């Protein structure tokens, strides 16, 4: 169980503690879609 929790923690903590990173990823994704 600890391994699963450790693997899941970064997935849930990253968008919460680093929302600006998620915004950058969204911008890159939309930019990539527009380029394609």
UniProtKB/Swiss-Prot annotation:
GO terms assigned for molecular function: toxin activity
Record's signal peptide: none
The species this protein was found in: Amanita exitialis
Coiled coil: none
Biotechnology: Amanexitides have a structure closely related to antamanide, a cyclic decapeptide with antidote activity against amatoxins and phallotoxins, and might therefore exhibit the same activity.
UniProt modification remark: Processed by the macrocyclase-peptidase enzyme POPB to yield a toxic cyclic nonapeptide. POPB first removes 10 residues from the N-terminus. Conformational trapping of the remaining peptide forces the enzyme to release this intermediate rather than proceed to macrocyclization. The enzyme rebinds the remaining peptide in a different conformation and catalyzes macrocyclization of the N-terminal 9 residues.
Family named by the database record: Belongs to the MSDIN fungal toxin family.
Protein name: Amanexitide proprotein 1
Propeptide intervals in chain numbering: 1-10, 20-36
